[in-house]
Every structure is written in C-alpha cells, then in structure tokens.
C-alpha cells in the first residue's frame, strides 16, 4: 500500500496518478479541505504560449530564485510542465483560454480558471480521487517509524500504528500560518515537516519564507489579492496616490514578491498607508469574479482603493528531495510545499507552486518502482541539531514571536531572541520556528526572501544551501 499524507494539489494528483497506474493508494489528511490549494488564487505557470519556451520559464525561475535554485530541478519542472498540463486536461480539467502575466515572469504563461484556480483544481481532483475509489480519511499524522534508514510505518491519532507501508508520500504543506499575519489556513503549521525531521529527514532552505505583498482584511476577513491583478493593470499606491514601488525597483508592481513585500513593509514602518487600486483593470468583474464578490460582501467595488499589507504566504524550504520526490530516507517521498526540491531557490516565482505540485504528483508513478537514489547535500553545509526540553508555547505566542523576530526584515538581536525562545521546546511548531530562525541567523547576508538589515547585501560566499539534520 502507498500512503499519501495530505490532500492538496500534490497529494491528490499523486493519488490519482498512482491509482491509474494500478497502485493501491490510501490518502490521509488532518482536514481534507484545510490546505493551501483551495485558497490559491493565481494559477499554474507553464510555457504553453507560442512566444514562450521551457528555457525562458527556467530563466525567470532562476533569476527570481536569486542564486539558490537547483538548476537540474528547474529544468526538469519547466520542461515537464506542458506534458503535465496535457495529462491534467486529459483527466477532464479545463483551463481558460487566456494566459495571464504575474510578477517576475517575462511572458504571459499563467494558466487559470477565473481568479480562484486553486479551489477549482482542488474540487476537481477531490471528486476524481473519490471516483477512482481512493480511500480518503481524515486523521492526523503523529509519528513516522524508521529503521536502518528505511520507512517501516507511521502512527496517526485515530488509527494508531500502520505497518503495511510500501511507500509513504508526505504532501502536508508548509508552515506560513506560524506567522501572525498569514494568507494561509490554520492547518498550515509545518507539523508534517517537523514529524519527518524527528524521523531523520534532512531539511533545507528554512530561512526562505515568502511574504505575499497584497493581502487585505476587510471587516476581519483575510483575503489574498491575486498576483494576476497587477498583471492586468492594478497599481499599488500610498495615501498620497504615489506609485512608490518604482523607488525600489524599476519593474514597479511587476517586481518579484520579495521586493514588493519588503517595499510595502518599509513604507508602512515610515507611517504610510498602502492601497491597491483596481480601477485600471478592464472588464474587472468578468476577469476577477471572486475578488468582486469579496469586495461586494464588504460594501465595496473595484473602484475603491483597497488597503493591503504583506503576509506570510509560502515556504521555499522543507524536506530536501530529488526530482523524483525522494528524501534521504528510503521509501519516504515529499512533494509539494512540504518539500524542498530546489525549484524555488531563495524566492519562489509566482504560480510555480501549483505547477510543482502537479509535476511531482502526476510524475510520481514513473519512479515508485525504481531503485532509491536519495539526495545529495554537496551544494551546501549540513548542520547537526539537537532538540530537547519541555517548554510549551501557545500557537498565538509562536505566531507573534515569528512575525516580530523572524519576519520580513531581520537582524541578529531578533533572531537570537527567537532561537533562545524555541531552543528548549520539542513542540512541532516550535521546532520548525527554531530551524527557521537558526537558518536565518546562520545566513549572514540578504538573498531572496531572506533580508537582514545588519547584512543588507548579497554575499557570493553564501551561494550555498543550509541543511539541518537531527542528532539524537
């Protein structure tokens, strides 16, 4: 039996692909609709346009990744994108005909379904998985059992010990809800990643947390304003109507997310209010019906300037894997946001996350019967970590500490404060927060999503990955 933990785009697409390849599959998720996929707004990046190519897509990905992309992975994902999209469409999913432009891309290459692509994909895949007869069970992963470097089973809250495990596929998502301001659901707390780390997987790139620049909260309802709004003409302004982003980057609203989030955050620290102006978008209600409905719920329309702020959105790091999704533990795969394939480097290109989930999920049947290759850590430094203690922290405390000390702008004092707070706790959320702060403290430079005001420049000596391995 192949067990998949997680019910987002990676887990569901892997389940369907494996089932259609004749494999026995069971999918377990702590909350079936609780992940990031149902709330993903933008789309799937793929070089399907006549003026585009996998090479151009790879170039954009590598440029935005700021020196830390795994080039082999980038070339694999961008070259597989078209084939995977064709497979997905052959399953019955229909994208809209127009391609959209998002920040960091040099071509229109974002496939979408209105402005709520993630929800449409999730609903489609969940229905398809059920039609394929895949058991989908709500339960929570507690522990992964490993012996002699190989998975032997796992433990869940309801089922207890499960031992009939041929392969275990983790698709449990990231941990951006561990920040006080977040665009993601409350299930996104990194527990799958922490459990895998405690079982012996190697984690990498934990310092690179991506903050989305355009999140709003009208009447307390947090809502992510999709990247494609800016591709279609939305402008970001301050209370004086100034498009201040051009003071930070010549691309203005179409600069990568790390630059925009930092710029908006700095403006807010200066005392400015920041808004998104949607009035320049043609045919707004047809192109963005979900945004229009959100605004209407709160008594607004697209001609009103909407207040925005940056919020934790995605994590580039995670369980280090190769292009097959294989970790350093035999028969333990990680796909989607829980993994670190090296695709995103120090900063993810918009709409590459849904693509990554589809590529690693749909292609998984190619590799499950092959001999295990595992990973290499030759492109970085492996740091051995011990975890101990019985300190207990509430999720509210952790979210506040991370936002204040391991957030958009970092420094030594704040990072050490966070490290000291988390170092005596074995809570899953504290372990992940500890490793994020520790990686950020170790990396004494600024690169991609990681910005330190005490080391504000990129250092070529730091063009290497930071790995963590648990020492028992």
From Swiss-Prot:
Cofactor(s) the protein requires to work: FAD
Active site per database record: 257 (proton donor/acceptor)
Subcellular location: Cytoplasm
Keywords for the protein's UniProt record, in alphabetical order: Cytoplasm, FAD, Flavoprotein, Nucleotide-binding, Oxidoreductase, Pyridine nucleotide biosynthesis
Enzyme Commission numbers on file: 1.4.3.16
pH dependence: Optimum pH is 8.0 (for L-aspartate oxidation). Optimum pH is about 10.0. Stable between pH 7.0 and 10.0.
Main location: cytoplasm
Activity relative to temperature: Optimum temperature is 65 degrees Celsius. Thermostable up to 80 degrees Celsius.
Taxonomic superkingdom: Archaea
Cellular component, GO, one term: cytoplasm
Site (Important in orienting the L-aspartate substrate): 102
Catalytic activity entry: L-aspartate + O2 = iminosuccinate + H2O2
Residues at which FAD binds: 7-10, 29, 36-37, 42-43, 191, 337, 353-354
InterPro entries per UniProt: FAD-dep_OxRdtase_2_FAD-bd, FAD/NAD-bd_sf, Fum_R/Succ_DH_flav-like_C_sf, Fum_Rdtase/Succ_DH_flav-like_C, NadB, Succ_DH/fumarate_Rdtase_cat_sf
The keyword Ribonucleoprotein belongs to this UniProt entry's keyword annotation: no
Keyword Cytoplasm among record annotations: yes
Pathway: Cofactor biosynthesis; NAD(+) biosynthesis; iminoaspartate from L-aspartate (oxidase route): step 1/1
Cofactor note: Binds 1 FAD per subunit.
A family per Pfam: FAD_binding_2
A GO molecular-function descriptor: L-aspartate oxidase activity
Family in the record: Belongs to the FAD-dependent oxidoreductase 2 family. NadB subfamily.
Free-text note regarding domains: Folds into three domains: the FAD-binding domain, the capping domain and the C-terminal helical domain.
Listed name of the protein: L-aspartate oxidase
Organism: Sulfurisphaera tokodaii (strain DSM 16993 / JCM 10545 / NBRC 100140 / 7) (Sulfolobus tokodaii)
Source taxonomy: Archaea, Thermoproteota, Thermoprotei, Sulfolobales, Sulfolobaceae
């Amino acid at each position: 039996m192949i067990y998949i933990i997680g019910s987002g785009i990676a887990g569901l697409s892997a389940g369907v692909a494996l089932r259609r390849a004749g494999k026995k599959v069971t999918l377990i998720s702590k909350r079936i609709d609780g992940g990031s996929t149902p709330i993903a707004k933008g789309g799937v990046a793929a070089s399907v346009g006549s003026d585009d190519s996998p090479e151009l897509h790879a170039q954009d990905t590598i440029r935005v990744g700021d020196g830390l992309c795994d080039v082999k992975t980038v070339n694999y994902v961008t070259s597989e994108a078209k084939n995977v999209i064709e497979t997905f469409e052959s399953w019955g999913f229909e994208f809209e005909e127009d391609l959209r432009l998002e920040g960091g891309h040099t071509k229109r290459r974002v496939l979408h379904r209105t402005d709520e692509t993630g929800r449409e994909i999730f609903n489609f895949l969940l229905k398809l998985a059920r039609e394929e007869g895949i058991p989908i069970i709500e339960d929570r992963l507690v522990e992964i059992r490993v012996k002699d470097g190989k998975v032997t089973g796992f433990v869940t809250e309801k089922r207890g010990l499960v031992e009939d495990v041929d392969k275990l596929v983790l698709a449990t998502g990231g941990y951006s809800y561990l920040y006080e301001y977040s665009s993601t659901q409350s299930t996104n707390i990194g527990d799958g990643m922490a459990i895998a780390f405690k079982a012996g997987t190697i984690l990498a790139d934990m310092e690179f947390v991506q903050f989305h620049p355009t999140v709003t909260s009208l009447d307390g309802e947090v809502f992510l304003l999709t990247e494609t709004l800016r591709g279609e003409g939305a402008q970001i302004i301050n209370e004086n109507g100034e498009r201040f982003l051009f003071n930070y980057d010549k691309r203005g609203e179409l600069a990568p997310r790390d630059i925009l989030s930092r710029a908006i955050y700095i403006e807010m620290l200066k005392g400015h209010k920041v808004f998104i102006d949607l009035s320049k978008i043609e045919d707004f209600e047809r192109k963005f019906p979900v945004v229009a409905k959100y605004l209407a719920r709160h008594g607004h329309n697209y001609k009103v300037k909407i207040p925005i702020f940056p919020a934790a959105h995605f994590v580039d790091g995670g369980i280090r894997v190769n292009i097959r999704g294989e970790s350093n533990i035999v028969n333990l795969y990680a796909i989607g946001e829980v993994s670190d394939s090296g695709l995103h480097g120090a900063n993810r290109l918009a709409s590459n996350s849904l693509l990554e989930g589809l590529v690693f999920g749909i292609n998984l049947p190619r590799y499950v019967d092959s001999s295990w290759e595992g990973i290499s850590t030759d492109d970085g430094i492996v740091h051995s970590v011990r975890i101990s203690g019985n300190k207990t922290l509430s999720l509210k405390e952790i979210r506040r500490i991370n936002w204040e000390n391991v957030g958009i702008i970092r420094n030594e004092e704040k990072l050490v404060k966070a490290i000291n707070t988390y170092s005596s706790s074995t809570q899953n959320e504290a372990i992940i927060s500890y490793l994020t702060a520790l990686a950020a403290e170790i990396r004494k430079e600024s690169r991609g999503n990681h910005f330190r005001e005490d080391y504000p420049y990129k250092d070529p000596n730091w063009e290497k990955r930071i790995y963590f391995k648990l020492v028992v």
